[in-house]
Amino acid sequence: GLSVVVIDFGLKNAILRESSRRKWNITVLPYTATAEEILRLDPDGVVLSSGPGNPNNVRRSVLEMIRTVQTKVPMFAIGLGHELFGIANGANVQQIPVEHHGVNHPIHEIITDHIVYATQAEGYLIDRNSVDRSQLFITYVDMLDNSVQGLRHRRYPAFSVQFFPDGAPGPDETDGLFDEFVDTMNRRGDRH
């Protein structure tokens, strides 16, 4: 199976379950791991997990790790990981007055024009006006408030979602994002 490093910001079991279903060889590292420690493991990909807390309080070294690792291996960031991926690439994250919680938020996937329903538990969101369009493009938006729900890097095989793509709890129509990550890792592996 593919070798995947998961950076633990408050890892959900559902992410491990999705990884197991795809027969990944998982190494879980703490958020304090450096880019060198991660890359020494020679992973096929890196997942930045979801978790609690204010993304604006993260150590600068975490942002430096993201900026370095995204240039070397495919990256998939979820929840807090998505927010940190955004910050590392120049976006701002702000606390929202009314948190998003629920299992069937309508999310617009821009590239396909499809509507998917996803589970959310969000207290912070990427400020859409702060997204550096030369670095990132917005891939998903919340249909209720037009908030940024997904990002993709323009130059590197790195993407992120604010919502839970694992269907636990809630709809599983977005768990194809894990398959997209597998495809990204496989394409990257073909170049070696």
Residues covered by each model-derived region:
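RNA-binding accessory domains that recognize and position tRNA/RNA substrates
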Residues: 1-41, 53, 166-168, 180-192
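Catalytic beta-strand/loop cores that center a nucleophilic Ser/Cys/Thr
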Residues: 114-156, 192
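Residues that mark the start of a beta-strand
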Residues: 3-5, 25, 74, 117, ...
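Cysteine-nucleophile active-site neighborhood
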Residues: 45, 50-128, 168-180, 185-188
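Active-site-proximal beta-strand elements of phosphoester/diester hydrolases
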Residues: 3-8, 118-119, 159-163
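Structured helix-beta-strand junction loops
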Residues: 22, 41, 71-72, 134, ...
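A short, acidic, flexible beta-alpha connecting loop/helix-capping segment that sits on the rim
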Residues: 155, 164-169
